[in-house]
């Protein structure tokens, strides 16, 4: 119940959420691993072996194993977005908020990123995604809510 949430509890609530941004939000002067370490350290992780294992785990989940030492400018847009998804998974969130995760990607790369999100969802994670790409909504049937004119509507879809 958010109406009774104390301000001091907000950081703990945030840790239950993973966020995927449209424009990746990677630190350009840090490697993939350093980007992920930054988040782990900021959320209280201290053991190097545990952090290394967690980074390897999330990079593997998004198909980026072997990219830990790459810099963001060495990655394609889709690869950067997969690192963003890995970052969102670091603290094992209950919900992943994805704000236009395919908005800056070409159609083929968008499908690849959606496949990563679909697999994460199939493994039990709730993903709340905002998108303007109706073709992706049709390709990946799920519970879909449409916001229009200040009102919310549920869109009923047929599964194929």
Where in the sequence are the language-model features?
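Short coil-to-helix segment of the ABC ATPase nucleotide-binding domain corresponding to the Q-loop/switch region
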Residues: 30-38
């Amino acid at each position: 119940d958010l109406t009774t949430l104390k301000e001091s509890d907000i950081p703990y609530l945030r840790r239950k959420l993973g966020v995927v941004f449209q424009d990746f939000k990677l630190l350009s002067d840090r490697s993939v691993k350093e980007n992920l370490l930054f988040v782990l350290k900021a959320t209280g992780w201290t053991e190097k072996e545990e952090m290394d294992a967690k980074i390897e785990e999330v990079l593997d989940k998004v198909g980026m194993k072997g990219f830990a030492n790459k810099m963001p400018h060495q990655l394609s847009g889709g690869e950067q977005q997969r690192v963003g998804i890995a970052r969102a998974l670091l603290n094992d969130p209950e919900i992943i908020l994805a704000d236009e995760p395919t908005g800056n990607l070409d159609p083929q790369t968008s499908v690849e990123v959606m496949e990563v999100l679909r697999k994460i969802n199939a493994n039990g994670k709730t993903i709340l995604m905002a998108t303007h790409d109706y073709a992706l909504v049709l390709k990946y049937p799920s519970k879909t809510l449409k916001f229009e004119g200040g009102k919310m509507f549920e869109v009923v879809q047929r599964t194929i």
